[in-house]
């Protein structure tokens, strides 16, 4: 059972790292949009860049969502002894909904900003 919990924890960690990498890639694509004059490019290039940016933003949110669900499951699986430790108490106090709202807000802002920069 402990091995299963460790694998699930590692899975949540990997998803969180992937979310971070995807958000960085989304920021990089925003730089391409702004500094590459994509607004003046052909329609096909604009569509390609917009699709890539939206895909990066949405996939980063999906990875973040998966990581949050994994960490929430870990909190639910804490034994009473684990929950009584300082780390257990800290895990139980995490504002999971805030993290989820922050992620979706960041994703929506990125998508709207990208589309406005491309099609303005």
Regions found by a protein language model. Name each.
Residues 1, 5-8, 75-98:
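Short membrane-interface loop/juxtamembrane segments of multi-pass integral membrane proteins
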Residues 1-58:
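Membrane-associated alpha-helix detector
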Residues 33-43, 49-56, 66-69, 83-93, ...:
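Terminal, low-complexity, charged helical segments
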Residues 58, 108-111:
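Single-pass alpha-helical transmembrane signal-anchor segments
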Residues 60-78:
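Membrane-water interface of transmembrane alpha-helices
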